[in-house]
Amino acid sequence: MASYEYVSPEQLAGFDKYKYSAVDTNPLSLYVMHPFWNTVVKVFPTWLAPNLITFSGFLLVVFNFLLLAYFDPDFYASAPGHKHVPDWVWIVVGILNFMAYTLDGVDGKQARRTNSSTPLGELFDHGLDSWSCVYFVVTVYSIFGRGSSGVSVFVLYLLLWVVLFSFILSHWEKYNTGILFLPWGYDISQVTISFVYIVTAVVGVEAWYEPFLFNFLYRDLFTAMIFGCALCVTLPMSLLNFFRSYKNNTLKHNSVYEAVVPFFSPCLLFILSTAWILLSPSDILELHPRVFYLMVGTAFANSTCQLIVCQMSSTRCPTLNWLLLPLFVIVMVVNVGVTPYVESILLFTLTAAFTLAHIHYGVRVVKQLSNHFHIYPFSLRKPNSDULGVEEKNIGL
């Protein structure tokens, strides 16, 4: 398994022909953030590899997740009568979230600035973004939490899926049209949430208990904004871009079946994970919501990364992700009946297995593409073909 190759020779050949094509029409991104990023990128030395910037931003997102997991493990810290998250934590999380967003915005500019743009860089960026979705959503949840003043863990589960499907829609579009239409919601949500974290530190979580307008609570506004943005903006725009490509006869997949294949694994993941929640004898989502979310988000990220590889290499997306097989088995076992202790062990084991499998997938794909393009993933130095494998082995790739 240590030398397993996930990227096929056909896909490697497809990467050689790949040309980046994206459309960004978001006014916030075009007129505010891009000028800001153009200034920030000048701070970085020209020897700094773009992938190192990307990975650093991802680590900040994970750190925020772990920080709030420590202070708010079960999402009760924001509820009345419970010990709240310290104000300084919200300030740290807000600053680091904006820093992560900034690093995600400047990595591509650093690549163009240093003339080091490669398909690996885009895959690395978007692959980590797919995993960041779950960390970002679950971290935001701590602002409201659950309880009388918050949102139930099942509603948050549904909100997580809305975000996940919104993310994969962009890459489904590109899989079919060849063009990545950058979603508006990403930039708006990152700036807004970074600000909300800081505001929470100033006014306290108690401020979110109060009605916003006409007895409309902030938690309801939070929920409505996510559902509304997905249903009224993200989904219609994706379908519009798809049908424009269909009308112009530029679709890359002519049959309906081939066009929707990328949705099979995510939909099966949704069905299986929801079935587990509904069939659980111990109400597993109530017991371990944070771990359950992480399990779902990691499995989703793995399927999304496979889609991105196929989309960039112009190859067919796998019909199903075999990573879902153990989840199917566990759902069947839970349906028969298990004790709460055993069910918890199954969840923690599966989450650990998904995480290790996804990390293995990522490391191996990065190594394959690094070897193929004769580059180092985290250095701008150009390796000799004879020593590339040796040095990567030394740094753990």
From Swiss-Prot:
Residues in coiled coil: none
Enzyme class: transferase
Protein name stated in the entry: Ethanolaminephosphotransferase 1
Gene3D superfamilies linked to this entry: 1.20.120.1760
This protein's pathway: Phospholipid metabolism; phosphatidylethanolamine biosynthesis; phosphatidylethanolamine from ethanolamine: step 3/3
Names of required cofactors: Mg(2+); Mn(2+)
Protein source organism: Bos taurus
Compartment(s) where it occurs, according to its Swiss-Prot or TrEMBL record: Endoplasmic reticulum membrane
Lineage: Eukaryota, Metazoa, Chordata, Craniata, Vertebrata
Protein function: Ethanolaminephosphotransferase that catalyzes the transfer of phosphoethanolamine (PE) from CDP-ethanolamine to lipid acceptors, the final step in the synthesis of PE via the 'Kennedy' pathway. PE is the second most abundant phospholipid of membranes in mammals and is involved in various membrane-related cellular processes. The enzyme is critical for the synthesis of several PE species and also catalyzes the synthesis of plasmanyl-PE, a lipid required for proper myelination and neurodevelopment, from 1-alkyl-2-acylglycerol.
